[in-house]
Structures are given as structure tokens and as C-alpha cells.
A protein has these predicted regions:
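N-terminal acidic, glycine/proline-rich low-complexity segments
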Residues: 2-216
Length: 216
């Protein structure tokens, strides 16, 4: 089993974040926290997407604002550790995803800056896989996979899918189920309990224990 070791100088993990910024304060808070660890990972995308409670709007400008704030303090961060990405590097990886909810916003002619950024990141000449942390809806990743499946050979699709690893927080639209069903070889983890940690830690703990027992 492979374990993710934060801070390992030999190997940084590649990461794309899908987040429904402006839905709730926790999305902005976790974005700030991520930036405080951005020297430990290779951030490949910061994509504003929709979710159940934010079904029609995306706010990439809110990600941009947090990256701008990171740029202000970066000069202090570099005094303590190496590897901090430049503000411009991160800004170049901010994008907006599907402006609609779930699979209703996925299909031919529905590509977005976010879905195109995903394809570009996965296609990069880099043998490392990309982890997708989906803290909202998954339909922007679904759109990227839709476009790849429509335009490439089965062998090329398989090579693309092999590089994608997903951690999905609670399945906040129907796109995650479509991805898992359509691409059964794609590495996909769904947490059914993470979101409950926000306001009921003990409830979340009990749910996690139940999930583990069911898995065993």
C-alpha cells in the first residue's frame, strides 16, 4: 500500500482541487489552509465548481483573492522553507468549471476553462498521477472525461484514466456516480462522513467507524 507522506523531499504529489467557493465559509478556509501547505505538493489546478447547495454559479474570483493574499505573505514563507510556488504559478491554475448542476451541465459543447485545465494537467509529460480532491460537485471532472472519451481511442482513454485518482467528499452531485460507472478502472474514493466533521465531530466519528466495519 502506498502512503502519502507530506513533506517528503523525494516525491511531491500532484493535486487538483474542485471547490464550491462562496457556498459556505469552510470552502474559503480550506483554500487558505491548502495554500499554507503549497510547498509540500504540486498544485495543478484550483477550480471553482457547483454543488448541491450552489447549483448554478461558480466563483473563481474568490480563489484568485486567496491566491493574491498568499502572494502578499509569500516573502515571509520562503524564509522558513523552500518550494513555495509563485503567486503567478497559482493564478495560472485558477479556473471556473461547469455553470450548472451535475450531469445536466455535462455533454458535447459544454467544455469549460476548468475541464480544459484538467485535460491539460493530466496530459502533461509527468509520470506521477494526479489526485483530485472534490470538495463539491464532480461534473467538471466528468466533462473532462466526457471530452477525452469522445476524441481519443480506447487505448488513449485508458492511459488518461490511469493517471486520475479521485477523493470525493460525500458525492455532492450525480457526476461522481457517472464517473465511477462509466470508468470502472478509475481509482475513486468517496467519503460519506467527512462533511459531517464540520458541525458534529462525534457523529462523523461514528459514521466513519460504521463505514470501516462495512468495508471489512
Amino acid at each position: 500500500m502506498e502512503y502519502l507522506s507530506i513533506g517528503s523531499p523525494e516525491k511531491k504529489y500532484r493535486l487538483v482541487i474542485l471547490t464550491d467557493m462562496e457556498n459556505e465559509p469552510d470552502d474559503s478556509q480550506t483554500m487558505v489552509r491548502l495554500l499554507m501547505y503549497s510547498n509540500e505538493i504540486d498544485i495543478e489546478g484550483l477550480i471553482a465548481v457547483t454543488s448541491k447547495w450552489l447549483p448554478r454559479l461558480v466563483f473563481p474570483e474568490s480563489i484568485t483573492a486567496r491566491v493574491n493574499a498568499y502572494g502578499v505573505v509569500r516573502k515571509n514563507l520562503v524564509k522558513h522553507a523552500a518550494g513555495w510556488p509563485s503567486e503567478q504559478y497559482l493564478l495560472d491554475r485558477v479556473a471556473g468549471g461547469q455553470r450548472g448542476y451535475g450531469m445536466s451541465a455535462v455533454g458535447d459543447g459544454k467544455s469549460t476553462e476548468g475541464s480544459e485545465l484538467i485535460i491539460k494537467a493530466v496530459d502533461k509529460e509527468d509520470s506521477r498521477p494526479i489526485w483530485f480532491a472534490i470538495n463539491a460537485g464532480a461534473n467538471t471532472l466528468a466533462q473532462a472525461l466526457w471530452d477525452v472519451r469522445k476524441t481519443r481511442s480506447p487505448e488513449e482513454v485508458a492511459a488518461f484514466v490511469k493517471k486520475v485518482k479521485v477523493y470525493d467528499d460525500s458525492g455532492q452531485d450525480d457526476a461522481g456516480a457517472w464517473i465511477a460507472h462509466t470508468f470502472p478502472d478509475l481509482f475513486y474514493i468517496r467519503s460519506r462522513s467527512q462533511v459531517f466533521v464540520l458541525d458534529a465531530p462525534m457523529t462523523a466519528y461514528r459514521r466513519i467507524v460504521m463505514d470501516v466495519k462495512q468495508a471489512i
